[in-house]
């Protein structure tokens, strides 16, 4: 799916909301260096096709594959009160060979 096709198939306003935040951690950085992938926190109801279209639209790169992970929120205690962390949907976006996505904001 190309960036042009993504704009016509999906609502652009929805695509701008699909990607919530990039995930920057040791594991995400290791995966990024190893397999040319980027990790994002995405909306709970986002599909792989929407995630692919959103990345292609926002960052102007070609996406090879998208893997999605649902993480259940943990139950946490603070004294007598019991709380719960939110559920999380994580997307591993693999880019085509030769494509690069710089989330650091620094120019090369």
UniProtKB/Swiss-Prot annotation:
One Pfam family here: Ribosomal_L23
GO molecular function terms attached to this record: rRNA binding; structural constituent of ribosome
Keywords: Ribonucleoprotein, Ribosomal protein, RNA-binding, rRNA-binding
InterPro entries, sorted: Nucleotide-bd_a/b_plait_sf, Ribosomal_uL23-like, Ribosomal_uL23/eL15/eS24_sf
One GO CC annotation: ribosome
Signal peptide start and end residues: none
An annotated GO BP: translation
Alphabetical list of SUPFAM superfamilies matching this protein: Ribosomal proteins S24e, L23 and L15e
Keyword Signal in record: no
Domain of life: Bacteria
Family listed: Belongs to the universal ribosomal protein uL23 family.
Its job: One of the early assembly proteins it binds 23S rRNA. One of the proteins that surrounds the polypeptide exit tunnel on the outside of the ribosome. Forms the main docking site for trigger factor binding to the ribosome.
Subunit (UniProt): Part of the 50S ribosomal subunit. Contacts protein L29, and trigger factor when it is bound to the ribosome.
NCBIfam families for the chain: PRK05738.1-3 (NF004359), PRK05738.2-4 (NF004363)
UniProt-recorded name of the protein: Large ribosomal subunit protein uL23
Lineage: Bacteria, Pseudomonadati, Pseudomonadota, Betaproteobacteria, Burkholderiales
Gene: rplW
